[in-house]
Design a protein with these regions (language model features):
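Membrane-embedded alpha-helical bundles that constitute the cytochrome b-like, heme-associated redox core
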Residues: 1-139
Length: 139
């Protein structure tokens, strides 16, 4: 069995409840944010090195699939930031409170706060996407 399959089956097979899902979401959102930053730095460098490629990148970013990716990116940034603050708080200020019950409770709080911040932002972004790309809502 390949190491990737072994790793993925280990990640998905382990049933650590909230702590496990918190770890996985933190890892995935960090990778998503890092991927975006890498692509963003690369395409911004096109302004200097290849201006025509930069204009092509802008056209791609105006597409529907890129707009949906941006909605996902906003979730990644918000969750990764809030969960990182949660982890930093327990590591630096309240290490004695780092226990399974508090892990469960704070995971749900950080996920709920993420959704409370993300849903309005995603709604506005999707509204603008539908308006600008498909002419809906008087666009």
């Amino acid at each position: 069995m390949s190491s990737i399959v072994t790793t993925l089956s280990g990640y998905l097979g382990y049933r650590g409840r909230e702590g496990h899902w918190s770890f996985l979401l933190h890892r995935i959102t960090g990778l998503g944010t890092g991927l975006f930053l890498t692509i963003h730095i690369l395409d911004t460098s096109f302004v200097y090195f290849a201006p025509s490629l930069y204009m092509e990148a802008i056209k791609i970013y105006q597409s529907t699939i890129a707009g949906l990716g941006e909605v996902g990116l906003v979730f990644c940034v918000i969750y990764h930031g809030l969960n990182g603050l949660r982890i930093a708080y327990f590591d630096m200020f309240a290490p004695k409170n780092w226990a399974i019950p508090s892990e469960r409770k704070t995971f749900w709080w950080s996920l709920g706060l993420t959704l409370a911040l993300w849903i309005p932002a995603a709604s506005i972004m999707l509204f603008n996407l539908l308006k600008n790309n498909y002419g809906l809502f008087g666009g």
